[in-house]
Amino acid sequence: MNSKFIVIEGLEGAGKTTARNIVVETLRSHGVKEVLFTREPGGTPLAEKLRELIKQGMADEKVTDKAEVLMLYAARVQLVDNVIKPALADGKWVIGDRHDLSSQAYQGGGRGIDQQLLRSLRDTVLGNFRPDLTLYLDLPPAIGLQRARQRGELDRIEQESLAFFDRTRTRYQALAAEDDSILTIDASQSIDAVSADIQAALQQWLQQQGLQPVVQVQY
């Protein structure tokens, strides 16, 4: 069984943790036993330090938009080369909480950084490495931000304006529309409905990969 890299994407408050649990349950019901979880930015000692800078910023210096995106790609290549690729080579399935699509949407859409620059960075840093499947949890930014506020204090990016997240969502939607490996899930529904949609979409994809549910034999 070939290992796969599955990524969960979406705005703040989209329900990525719930989605991850559904993905794991579905994978295990199809016989996948070894699963590794990653998050971006983060996942290695260096990447975690960069995560803190990206999320919290600095008290005495502004983090510029280009510095932010360069830190994101530095953290990403550390994670991909030191964790994700070795895990895949070892036969593990990897479930990522965010990957490159986040940079294309947040920095490209939200920040307005040139898309060609972002694609050039992606291709230079990651080569042709891409997720096998991305589940994009789509919901209106106002709903997501309300959920995020209920979790507690907002980080530097979560404190951005509603217009920022509107631009980010628009870019997410455009990217999902042009890439068959990105499946869009309506995350504004109830938890049960979202879970059912994720499970159905993932089961169909797994069947396309040649994986069927494991039948439990009763004695």
Swiss-Prot record:
What Enzyme Commission number(s) does the record list for this chain? Answer: 2.7.4.9
Q: Which GO terms describe its biological process?
A: dTDP biosynthetic process; dTTP biosynthetic process; dUDP biosynthetic process
What UniProt keywords apply to this chain's record, in alphabetical order?
ATP-binding, Kinase, Nucleotide biosynthesis, Nucleotide-binding, Transferase
Q: Which GO terms describe its molecular function?
A: ATP binding; dTMP kinase activity
The superkingdom listed in its UniProt entry is Bacteria
InterPro entries cross-referenced by the UniProt entry:
P-loop_NTPase (IPR027417), Thymidylate_kin-like_dom (IPR039430), Thymidylate_kin_CS (IPR018095), Thymidylate_kinase (IPR018094)
Gene Ontology CC annotations of this record: cytosol
What is the catalytic activity of this protein? dTMP + ATP = dTDP + ADP
Q: Please state what class of enzyme this protein is.
A: transferase
| HAMAP family assigned to the protein according to its UniProt record, in alphabetical order | Thymidylate_kinase (MF_00165)
User: What family classification does the UniProt entry report for this protein?
Assistant: Belongs to the thymidylate kinase family.
Q: What does this protein do?
A: Phosphorylation of dTMP to form dTDP in both de novo and salvage pathways of dTTP synthesis.
Indicate what this protein is called per its UniProt record: Thymidylate kinase
